[in-house]
């Protein structure tokens, strides 16, 4: 059975000896669309296909990196490397095990609806007043938050970044689009909003925003302690279309993301079977 907690409540807790494998897999994730989707999908696979118990924990990325490096969490499936999360990797990378890339070509940047008459970051000052001089961002611990502050400086933008959360940011985007109003947000692909709205990532001629791969990282000793789970993670890859399909299904549903992920797993069983280690 999946348990969901906040990280502050469980730091320092030991691994529980329960379930078929007498082990609980502890996965930490941020409140980001792709992280929610991938983490709940892996929880479904581990529990329903492989017999493990899973404990899910939400936290900011800096807290997650610290907890995984310290061994308080087993896995983090949403590490944007080598660029967006570079400061965290510089601090904790030597203590983490790399379990491969789930998807490549992970794009970050400033995003606007296609009805807006700007195509590049260096054009934003021309509509700064229409935007109330604001860029709608996410949490201050996110790599894209730091990159956006750098973009404001590099492009000398007459804008300030307003921190919020992934859900709050997409809610603001949806409200603006419904009213055909101008808005600029910090965005990334893959994300369900690109499947729902007509959006464009603004050109970045100064190259402030990097392209990354989304990696899975584990605590020290994880591959030795849980080799079957480590092999699952090494095998786990998704196309942008597959991940977008899962993210949209979760966002469209009032059900728990874990239940939606389970339904997606059953509808894509051949794909899931290709990830599961076979003896």
Predicted feature locations:
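Ligand-binding cleft/hinge of the Venus flytrap
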Residues: 42-51, 128-161, 266
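Short helix-initiation/N-cap motifs at beta->coil->alpha
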Residues: 32-33, 55-67, 161-172
